A protein has these predicted regions:
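Nucleotidyl polymerases of mobile genetic elements and RNA viruses
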Residues: 1-188
Length: 188
C-alpha cells in the first residue's frame, strides 16, 4: 500500500493554442512527486523489458526495436497493392482522442490478468493508478485535492506502457473478428 500523499499529483494546464478560449485548448500534464516518479520509473523500466513479448507486433510505440512509422508504411503498401489489383479494401484508423483519459482501471487489470501478469505486479500497478489524487493548478494556485477515478496520467512514466496493454485488448478483439470471418485480413 502506498503511503498517503506519495501518489499526489498537481495537474498543470498547458495551452495547445496561442490564445486558449476553452478547456479543450489546454493539455493537462501531471506533475508527480519525486518518490512516486522513482517508483513508477522502476516499474516502467521492468515493463519496458517485457512489453515486446506481451503485445502484438502491430503495436510499435514505446517498444524497443520497433519503429512507429512501420504501421504507416505497411498501410501505404496495402492501399497501393489494393489499388493495383482493384480489390476492395476497408482500413481501420483508430484515433485515440484523450487516449490516456479513457483507460478504465478495471479493464486494464482484466487485460493484465488475461496476459498472465503475476498478481503482485497487478497489485503494484493498481496501487499506482487507483490511489492517485490530484489538484489542478489555476494561475499557479492549487484547487482542493480530489481522487482520480480513471485514466492514466500524462507525465507518469508508466502511462505509455499501461496504455499499450489496454490497447492490446482492442487488437485482440480485431484479430478475433478476423478469425471468425467477420472481417478478412489483408496479407502483406
Amino acid at each position: 500500500c502506498l503511503i498517503k500523499g506519495l501518489n499526489f499529483t498537481f495537474i498543470a494546464l498547458i495551452p495547445k493554442v496561442g490564445s486558449p478560449q476553452c478547456l479543450n485548448d489546454f493539455r493537462p500534464i501531471s506533475l508527480v512527486g519525486s518518490l512516486y516518479k522513482i517508483l513508477a520509473k522502476v516499474l516502467a523500466n521492468r515493463l519496458r523489458l517485457i512489453i515486446g513479448s506481451v503485445i502484438s507486433e502491430s503495436q510499435t510505440a514505446f517498444v524497443k526495436d520497433r519503429q512507429i512509422l512501420d504501421g504507416i508504411l505497411i498501410a501505404n503498401e496495402v492501399v497501393d497493392e489494393a489499388r493495383k489489383s482493384k480489390k476492395e479494401l476497408m482500413l481501420f484508423k483508430v484515433d485515440y482522442e484523450k487516449a490516456y483519459d479513457s483507460v478504465d482501471w478495471d479493464y486494464l487489470d482484466d487485460v493484465m490478468g488475461r496476459m498472465s501478469f503475476p498478481t503482485m505486479w497487478r497489485k503494484w500497478i493498481k496501487e499506482c493508478v487507483c490511489t492517485a489524487t490530484a489538484s489542478v493548478l489555476v494561475n499557479g494556485s492549487p484547487t482542493n485535492e480530489f481522487p482520480l477515478k480513471r485514466g492514466l496520467r500524462q507525465g507518469d512514466p508508466l502511462s505509455p506502457f499501461l496504455f499499450l496493454l489496454a490497447a492490446e485488448g482492442l487488437n485482440v478483439l480485431m484479430k478475433a473478428m478476423v478469425e471468425n470471418n467477420l472481417f478478412t485480413g489483408y496479407s502483406v
